[in-house]
């Protein structure tokens, strides 16, 4: 019996989306090195890509469980700043991270590094894992730190 002719089965009419994906995974653990942007175009169901996503990147590690899992693709919109609580992709000390962004008042030993020319002490960025077995990463002003983008899924 032909299932399509019987109308008991309808093939998926959704066109696949073609989107860039960085093939080197970002760490959801202790950090993985991101060597430049190694993009490859992949095809995925269009409904799986959130509106505004500019690229995908694979997750490596368990520090963002239970929300994100190793091998999963997260969809990212490029940006240079995030709000506290946003999940993002970051480069810190030449390693790529998938973490929740937060900010803390720097301790006294670090305060001078976060003080601007007007004497205003700014908050210290902190990268937080969702898996509580991992400690937060306090961002040192002496290391390169970059917000790559916001995770949309």
Q: Over which residues does each language-model region extend?
A:
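N-terminal cationic amphipathic segment used for targeting or macromolecule association
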Residues: 2-3, 26, 86, 127
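Acidic/glycine-rich C-terminal interaction modules and beta/coil loop segments
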Residues: 47-153
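Structured loops at beta-to-helix junctions and adjacent beta-edge loops in soluble globular domains
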Residues: 22-24, 130
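Short, flexible coil/linker elements and helix-boundary hinge sites characteristic
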Residues: 7, 38-43, 119, 142
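Short beta-strand/loop turn elements enriched in aromatics
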Residues: 25-62
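Helix-turn-helix/homeodomain-like alpha-helical modules used for DNA recognition
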Residues: 11-19, 31
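Helix-turn-helix-like N-terminal two-helix hairpins of bacterial/phage DNA-binding regulators
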Residues: 1-14
């Amino acid at each position: 019996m032909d299932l399509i002719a019987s109308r008991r089965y309808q093939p998926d009419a959704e066109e696949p989306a073609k989107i860039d994906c960085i093939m080197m995974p970002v760490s959801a653990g202790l950090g993985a090195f991101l060597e430049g942007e190694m993009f490859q175009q992949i095809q995925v169901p269009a409904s799986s890509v959130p509106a505004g996503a500019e690229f995908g990147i694979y997750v490596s590690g368990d520090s963002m469980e239970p929300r994100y899992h190793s091998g999963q693709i997260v969809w990212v919109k490029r940006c240079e700043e995030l709000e506290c609580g946003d999940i993002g992709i970051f480069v810190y000390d030449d390693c790529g991270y998938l973490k929740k962004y937060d900010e803390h008042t720097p301790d006294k030993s670090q305060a001078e590094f976060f003080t601007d020319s007007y004497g205003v002490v700014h908050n210290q960025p902190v990268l937080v894992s969702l898996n509580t077995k991992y400690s937060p990463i306090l961002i040192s002003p002496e290391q390169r730190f970059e917000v790559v983008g916001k995770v949309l899924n």
